[in-house]
């Protein structure tokens, strides 16, 4: 799910630039990416505020997850987009579990009125208290299949994102939609509102006033006219989480096409408001590109027998309802995020709030992959924006320890951005081929498919495919606060590049990280990349080079969540000494790329007389703080013997 606050301005830009940018397909593509990209941290922050509101206002499931296993819903609803009201029935089929206690429970808001419940063709007594329907049904065996039909009506409550919303379009036409993630389904229909139980299939039959159309999950089986109403029948035959079941109603204009994918042709449907249909249809090529790309990069689209679609709605963002995302617009930023949720979030759903990154970080990262594939040169900019946003604060980790704190669960900087950055670092650490094969292995796991997963499941597949122990990688980047800071001092001595690298951390008291890190060496415009093993708080690296270096840069492709400070040391002699301030007078700092010892440093004036001074050697042995009496103007020489018995001198000017 994404909250996009700038979709209206993007839509206006369509009209402004359409005639100019229709010159070539390439220009159209670049424009479509550009107008849909707003500063991602703004989008994600607004989205997180909505997520927090939703989490605060919506109560969790009351039903006993261990009592029954829901297998099927038959939903029959009567709605009118001009009236906030719903009536109908829900048939629920389920299996009894070993833990069945004699009571069947479903979630249903107290704002809804339950008229009656049929069980085995007979009316059954029930209680409806504290947003929960309870029925006593005795004498059933483990695994036995049973069902009931709940008849109800009422004015749905509004919680979280609204749950059940009636509104008007930009030109005043009535519209309604539902948005249940994660605990709003009970506000408008009786169900088992669970994050651990997916129904195997559903049928949805909706009656609406003629002139409206209904968008929902799965395939549209039929549309019939009965008196003054349209009756739409949608059928979905894949396991689905309760919060992903949805309907949207308005005077939609509809268009569709068959899109060739790796395993056949996929139906792609779009339900757009008439006033926006032109913009939507013009931007549809973005959707087609993304579906084909993800389908070939990962595993085939998970709901291939049915469809993928978009239904326009009035909430300023998007929601990844299974096979039919509800969208404010279909610009590339929003579209690619919601589409990728069909693999990461719908097909495989995170099993706990601690692991929410398996949904949101992955969808965020796949937006970046869309830019990498289709917007030449924008992916590094996108990564740099991500990194800048993550580093705007020093602390924070991806996995959530306190799942009762909404600020922790829905932190946009961490749940979305930092998690996406971790995926990019993993990709660069184990290599592209292994990384994407690991994603495919994860998605192909039959124990996770159409079910729920935890971070440990993802790690298992990445370790299996890479044949590497990635414990340290994931512990550092997912479970540890903050990020490393590297101070790199360098000097070239003939054919050797001498590097002194000190590592600190954005959060004090954190154990230092170990990781590989790229450094770019430049010579007359030519770039050579070396990979460094960073594994201590203070290390000295010497690289043999056959050329002179003009400059160095680190992580040129913006792949690592590491802050660096680079300093070139002016080399005098073979040992690369630096003294500053130079010129100076009485207090100096002497630095070396090799370890020093106080007794090995002597100071002489221009006629060879030794000058006495006081000094303090740093704990790491590379820096000597020097204090002298006020010096006469002139040239002085420091003579240095380092711990590895290398002799060198450096000149100093006093003034």
Where are these regions (language model features)?
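C-terminal outer-membrane/trafficking sorting elements
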Residues: 32, 571-580, 584-655
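Acidic/His/Gly-enriched intrinsically disordered linker/tail segments
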Residues: 360-429, 446-449
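Glycine/proline-rich low-complexity spacer/linker segments in large multi-domain proteins
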Residues: 65, 142, 151-203, 558-582
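Amphipathic alpha-helical substructures
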Residues: 412-499
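A surface-exposed beta-strand-loop module
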Residues: 38-41, 109-169, 542-546
């Amino acid at each position: 799910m994404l909250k996009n606050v700038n979709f209206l301005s993007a839509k206006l830009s369509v009209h402004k630039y359409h005639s100019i940018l229709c010159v070539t397909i390439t220009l159209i593509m670049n424009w479509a990416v550009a107008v849909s990209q707003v500063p991602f941290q703004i989008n994600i922050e607004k989205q997180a505020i909505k997520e927090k509101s939703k989490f605060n206002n919506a109560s969790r499931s009351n039903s006993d997850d261990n009592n029954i296993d829901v297998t099927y819903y038959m939903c029959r609803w009567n709605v009118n987009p001009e009236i906030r009201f719903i009536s109908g029935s829900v048939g629920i089929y389920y299996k009894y579990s070993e833990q069945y206690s004699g009571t069947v429970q479903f979630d249903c808001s107290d704002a809804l009125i339950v008229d009656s419940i049929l069980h085995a063709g007979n009316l059954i007594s029930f209680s409806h208290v504290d947003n929960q329907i309870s029925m006593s049904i005795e004498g059933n065996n483990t695994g036995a299949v049973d069902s009931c039909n709940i008849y109800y009506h009422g004015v749905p409550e509004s919680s979280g994102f609204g749950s059940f919303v009636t509104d008007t379009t930009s030109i005043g036409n009535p519209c309604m939609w539902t948005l249940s993630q994660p605990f709003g389904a009970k506000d408008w229909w009786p169900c088992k509102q669970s994050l651990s139980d997916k129904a195997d299939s559903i049928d949805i039959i909706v009656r609406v006033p003629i002139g409206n159309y209904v968008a929902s999950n799965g395939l549209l089986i039929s549309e019939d006219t009965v008196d003054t109403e349209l009756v739409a029948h949608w059928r979905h035959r894949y396991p689905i989480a309760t919060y992903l079941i949805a309907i949207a109603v308005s005077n939609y204009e509809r268009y569709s096409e068959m899109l060739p994918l790796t395993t056949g042709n996929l139906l792609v449907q779009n339900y757009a408001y008439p006033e926006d249909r032109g913009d939507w249809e013009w931007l549809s090529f973005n959707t087609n590109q993304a579906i084909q790309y993800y389908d070939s990069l990962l595993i085939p689209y998970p709901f291939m027998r049915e469809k993928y679609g978009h239904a326009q709605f009035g909430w300023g963002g998007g929601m990844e309802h299974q096979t039919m995302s509800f969208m404010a617009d279909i610009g590339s930023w929003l579209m690619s995020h919601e589409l990728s949720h069909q693999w990461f979030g719908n097909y495989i759903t995170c099993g706990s709030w601690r692991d929410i990154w398996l949904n949101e970080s992955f969808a965020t990262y796949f937006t970046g992959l869309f830019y990498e594939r289709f917007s030449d040169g924008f992916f590094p900019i996108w990564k740099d924006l991500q990194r800048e946003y993550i580093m705007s604060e020093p602390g924070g980790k991806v996995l959530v320890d306190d799942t009762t704190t909404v600020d922790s669960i829905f932190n946009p900087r961490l749940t979305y951005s930092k998690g996406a950055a971790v995926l990019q670092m993993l990709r660069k650490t184990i290599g592209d081929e292994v990384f994407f094969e690991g994603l495919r292995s994860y998605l192909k796991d039959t124990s996770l498919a159409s079910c729920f997963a935890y971070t440990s499941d993802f790690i298992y597949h990445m370790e299996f495919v890479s044949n590497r122990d990635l414990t340290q990688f994931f512990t550092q980047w997912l479970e540890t606060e903050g990020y490393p800071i590297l101070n790199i001092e360098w000097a070239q001595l003939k054919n050797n590049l001498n590097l002194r690298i000190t590592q600190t951390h954005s959060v004090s008291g954190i154990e230092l990280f170990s990781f590989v890190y790229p450094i770019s060496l430049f010579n007359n415009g030519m770039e050579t990349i070396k990979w460094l093993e960073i594994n201590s708080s203070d290390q000295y690296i010497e690289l043999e080079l056959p050329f002179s270096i003009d400059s160095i840069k680190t992580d040129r492709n913006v792949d690592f969540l590491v802050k660096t400070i680079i300093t070139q040391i002016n080399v005098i002699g073979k040992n690369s000494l630096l003294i500053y301030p130079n010129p100076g007078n009485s207090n100096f700092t002497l630095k070396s790329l090799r370890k020093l010892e106080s007794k090995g440093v002597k100071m002489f004036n221009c006629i060879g007389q030794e000058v006495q001074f006081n000094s303090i050697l740093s704990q790491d042995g590379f820096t000597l703080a020097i204090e002298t009496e006020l010096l006469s103007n002139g040239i002085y020489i420091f003579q240095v013997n380092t711990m590895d018995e290398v002799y060198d001198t450096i000149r100093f000017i006093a003034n």
